[in-house]
Amino acid sequence: DENGVCSRCREYEESILPLWNHGKGHESELAGLLEDIRRKGEGMPYDCIFGMSGGLDSSYMLHLAVKEWKLRPYVFHIDAGWNLPVAEENIRRICDKLGLELHIKKMNPEEMRQMQLAFFRAGHAALDAPQDHSFIAEIDKLACELGVKYILNGYNISTEVVSNPKSWDKGAGYAGDGTYIKDLLRHWCTMPITEYTFTSGFKHKVWIPYLLGVKTIKPLNLVPVTKSQMTETLVQEYGYEPYGQKHFENLLTK
């Protein structure tokens, strides 16, 4: 702009900084949320769906969900073919220590490779959209099948500190827009995709939250957290292995 400040810095100042208080002061909001999760999950095997990546945020949130908040999550992991051993070992250690059954969906590796190559060929900025869309689509599918009313999302401002550029927000965002992804594959993918699960912006943004009443929540924004504190807790409690920088548990995002 006229002051030499880039648009990304302005987006940070407008979208992130006003909300970033390190999760302080949300005790009553969190208590009410947890009470509602337990109430709506009464009489069911699970009271929430929990997507586990093996990264720091999801690992710490699972610790809180089970050990501190006494929730009964359906723990789900998508193996899109890019897992690094550190992620798989961290997932195993935490689930074993907490006595949780881990449900794994392994994607067709050749389909994932070809979809990823299609995004490279297209010169697309959101290169992780194929794996991210599979996460969204499978969890949308689980929400319909299990009947639970809450999905726990590990995103939090304290460790993310960024927002996606506004130019990425089309439909449900590239990762949530199955129509957009299918169209890109029609132009750039060299093989038919038959086993991959797609969702749509309508299903993800309208059907699931409003017609089925399933809420996706980000509880780590409601508790005081820092990267060092989360890491220390996980190392002491579960023998968690730190993996360096953000998203370095995954070969693609690393």
Which residue ranges define each predicted feature?
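Nucleotide-activated chemistry modules centered on ATP-dependent adenylation/adenylyltransferase
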Residues: 1-48, 64-254
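Short, glycine-rich nucleotide/cofactor-binding loops
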Residues: 48-57
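Hydrophobic positions on the alpha1 helix immediately C-terminal to the Walker A/P-loop
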Residues: 60-61
